[in-house]
UniProtKB/Swiss-Prot annotation:
SUPFAM superfamilies for the chain: Cystine-knot cytokines
Protein name: Bone morphogenetic protein 2-B
GO cellular component: extracellular space
Organism: Xenopus laevis (African clawed frog)
GN (gene name): bmp2-b
Glycosylation sites: 137, 202, 237, 340
Keyword Secreted: yes
GO biological processes: cartilage development; cell differentiation; ossification
SS bond list: 298-363, 327-395, 331-397
Protein's UniProt keywords contain Secreted: yes
């Protein structure tokens, strides 16, 4: 049961925020809201639940996420969020977000991350090779989303032992799509090479591999998902070089808290056909010089939505809240230029001055902008998504 103050805050949030979103709350819902202020606590809770469900649907969620306490947010997803929220620190060199990833996000408005299922057994080492099979459950990707790009990210640690710099200390990482799993009589699965990389042991960093063809085959073409094979080939026979520096599986000596931060990560970039891509900034109109106006006239008012106040901070990772603003005020006759009115609003206001049965023009948002949100979905998958029309940039009489 939601506490009384919590219910009031959430209902007020819906009333103000959704008042600027045409069609988001039907007239019946608005009537129920006004009636809820006079109804019993049980009826108020029902109205609250209906509002919450409608807003969750706007976010593309079927139910309110209830993530566990041990869910780890990949640092890479936080970097992406800060990048697209223009909140990165000046020193961007330490960020794992590179140009290639920014370009991938330029065609998407949604980024999803997936960890592999660790039930898969490691394929025994064969000579100079370490081979691991990975399976990622992608069932949480909605059918209406078009996956535009996908990356498999693997962490490699710097080798601490002294080594030569003549290029002999190299590993090759090959990523394969399992087209057909191994049959009982066959020697191994049928695979297709997706990407390959020659790496040195000289630094700790993430390596990104393009696996878009496999994800497209699984999602768009509805073909079976048998996972990937990651093959690490050691190009030298120096036993002093640890072969576990490429982190494709968890070692027994590794700290339990450290493994979730360096385990392999599959990242998909997709677009649901709504709004703009993540990297595209909607150009905001230049603010005109503020004219002296009546305090009661139509204008933008401050409204800060704090997700902890409405009880959503357990699944919304970032931002903790945002400035939504709202429009309120009179549209008096005659309509002044600074009220950003349409010709129809001017005519309607003129008619209202002689016939009060015709309502005045309304103070509504005339310009809205998007925000990026990083959250955990119903399946505890980390999602970064661009949501349109979340911030009021301008108001006018319409």
């Amino acid at each position: 049961m939601v506490a009384g103050i919590h219910s009031l805050l959430l209902l007020q949030f819906y009333q103000i925020l959704l008042s600027g979103c045409t069609g988001l709350v039907p007239e019946e819902g608005k009537r129920k809201y006004s009636e809820s202020t006079r109804s019993s606590p049980q009826q108020s809770q029902q109205v609250l639940d209906q509002f919450e469900l409608r807003l969750l649907n706007m976010f593309g969620l079927k139910r309110r996420p209830t993530p566990g306490k041990n869910v780890v947010i990949p640092p890479y997803m936080l970097d992406l969020y800060h990048l697209h929220s223009a909140q990165l620190a000046d020193d961007q060199g330490s960020s794992e977000v590179d140009y290639h990833m920014e370009r991938a996000a330029s065609r998407a408005n949604t980024v999803r991350s997936f960890h592999h299922e660790e039930s898969m057994e490691e394929i025994p080492e064969s000579g100079e090779k370490t081979i691991q099979r990975f399976f990622f459950n992608l069932s949480s990707i909605p059918d209406e989303e078009l996956v535009t790009s996908s990356e498999l990210r693997i962490f490699r640690e710097q080798v601490q032992e002294p080594f030569k710099t003549d290029g002999s200390k190299l590993h090759r990482i090959n990523i394969y799509d399992i087209v057909k799993p191994a049959a009982a009589a066959s020697r191994g699965p049928v695979v297709r090479l997706l990407d390959t990389r020659l790496i040195h042991h000289n630094e700790s960093k993430w390596e990104s591999f393009d696996v878009t063809p496999a994800i497209t085959r699984w999602i768009a073409h509805k073909q079976p998902n048998h996972g990937f094979v990651v093959e690490v080939t050691h190009l030298d026979n120096d036993t002093n070089v640890p072969k576990r520096h490429v982190r494709i599986s968890r070692s027994l000596t590794l700290d339990k808290g450290h493994w979730p931060r360096i385990r392999p990560l599959l990242v998909t970039f997709s677009h649901d056909g709504k709004g703009h891509a993540l990297h595209k900034r909607q150009k905001r109109q230049a603010r005109h010089k503020q004219r002296k106006r009546l305090k009661s006239s139509c204008r933008r008012h401050p409204l800060y939505v704090d997700f902890s106040d409405v009880g959503w901070n357990d699944w919304i990772v970032a931002p903790p809240g945002y400035h939504a603003f709202y429009c309120h005020g009179e549209c008096p006759f005659p309509l002044a230029d600074h009220l950003n009115s349409t010709n129809h609003a001017i005519v309607q206001t003129l008619v209202n001055s002689v016939n009060t049965n015709i309502p005045k023009a309304c103070c509504v948002p005339t310009e809205l902008s998007a925000i990026s949100m990083l959250y955990l979905d119903e399946n505890e998958k980390v999602v970064l998504k661009n949501y349109q029309d979340m911030v009021v940039e301008g108001c006018g009489c319409r």
